[in-house]
UniProtKB/Swiss-Prot annotation:
Cofactor(s) required for function per UniProt: Zn(2+)
Record's protein name: Acetyl-coenzyme A carboxylase carboxyl transferase subunit beta
Physiological role: Component of the acetyl coenzyme A carboxylase (ACC) complex. Biotin carboxylase (BC) catalyzes the carboxylation of biotin on its carrier protein (BCCP) and then the CO(2) group is transferred by the transcarboxylase to acetyl-CoA to form malonyl-CoA.
EC number per UniProt: 2.1.3.15
Places the protein is found: Cytoplasm
Binding-site residues, Zn(2+): C29, C32, C48, C51
Quaternary context: Acetyl-CoA carboxylase is a heterohexamer composed of biotin carboxyl carrier protein (AccB), biotin carboxylase (AccC) and two subunits each of ACCase subunit alpha (AccA) and ACCase subunit beta (AccD).
Residue ranges constituting the CoA carboxyltransferase N-terminal domain according to the UniProt record: 25-294
Molecular function GO labels: acetyl-CoA carboxylase activity; ATP binding; carboxyl- or carbamoyltransferase activity; zinc ion binding
UniProt catalytic activity: N(6)-carboxybiotinyl-L-lysyl-[protein] + acetyl-CoA = N(6)-biotinyl-L-lysyl-[protein] + malonyl-CoA
Organism: Blochmanniella pennsylvanica (strain BPEN)
Main enzyme class: transferase
Length: 294
């Protein structure tokens, strides 16, 4: 037997057993493609430790990680969606709701909680993008107005994390009127001199960006978040021009003065607390203590 035959001789190859890795342990970054340990990613609030890409995070997880542990109580859960128009496109709206509720374990696209942030009383709301694209429905509008009313009642600031594709077309005018409804509610908050901070996350588009998302006393965005009314492809097709690089991203909007700050997700809790402390004339937090997600 020649040396080359000895190398490729099957009898010398040691068989190995394939190890089955349980699902849900590893995941890939949407941006850099790096393989990431899921537990580590969750600890980092779904921010890639390799490239700092901000992935989508569940609304409930976001609120639990933002508010003080053990201080949260949910508001507005009694509001539930109804298919009043019996709307149907390629699928019945009723079926879309059932499917979205099954996937997200939520009743609609906005979650509202009351709690404390470094000991300060606060009402916080967060959009669930996985629920029909975080679209604004009559229930979303009702819950947001309820959040504003609760902030007025206990005289505390309101913080809202937006992630939405816009108004929910399946509810037609009932969805569109939520733009005016939420804006009017925020006007009441402004009259009482209570701070409202809007945190725009990827993506914040359509009717949400044209109403409650841009009405904050401070408008903050996460890095590289897509923010606008119509999408960049639609704008390019309409104006028939090539848009600038990074158009509608948070960095572009900050440069043009449309937003006030860009803050990384892991830093939001501490920095928003500092801003609210200044706005409400309370002691500014000194140390950002870490706590586990509930």
């Amino acid at each position: 037997m020649s040396w080359i035959e000895r190398i490729f001789n099957k009898s010398t190859i040691i068989p190995t057993r394939k190890i089955d890795i349980p699902k849900g342990i590893w995941t890939k970054c949407d941006n850099c493609g790096q393989l990431l340990y899921k537990k580590e990613l969750e600890r980092n609030l779904e921010v890639c430790p390799k490239c700092d890409h901000h992935m989508r995070i569940a609304a409930r997880v976001r609120l639990f990680s933002f508010l003080d542990k053990g201080s949260t109580s949910e508001l507005g859960s009694e509001f539930e969606p109804k298919d009043v128009l019996k709307f149907r496109d390629s699928k019945r709206y009723k079926d879309r709701l059932i499917s979205a509720q099954k996937i997200t374990k939520e009743k609609d696209a906005l979650i509202v909680m009351q709690g404390t942030l470094y000991g300060m009383k606060i009402v916080a709301a967060s959009f669930e993008f996985a629920f029909i694209g975080g679209s604004m429905s009559s229930v979303v509008g009702a819950r947001f107005v309820h959040a504003v009313n609760q902030a007025l009642k206990i005289k505390c600031p309101l913080v809202c994390f937006t992630a939405s594709g816009g108004a929910r077309m399946q509810e037609a005018l009932m969805s569109l009127m939520q733009m005016a409804r939420t804006s009017a509610a925020l006007a009441n908050l402004h009259e009482r001199c209570l701070p409202y901070i809007s945190v725009l996350t990827n993506p914040t588009m359509g009717g949400v960006s044209a109403s409650l998302a841009m009405l904050g006393d401070l408008n903050i965005a996460e890095p590289k978040a897509l923010i606008g009314f119509a999408g960049p492809r639609i704008i390019e097709q309409t104006v028939r021009e090539k848009l600038p690089l990074g158009f509608q991203r948070s960095e572009f909007l900050l440069e043009k003065g449309s937003i006030d700050l860009i803050i990384r997700r892991p830093d939001l809790r501490f920095k928003v607390a500092g801003l609210l402390a200044k706005l409400t004339q309370q002691p500014i937090p000194k140390v950002d203590y870490r706590h586990c997600v509930e």
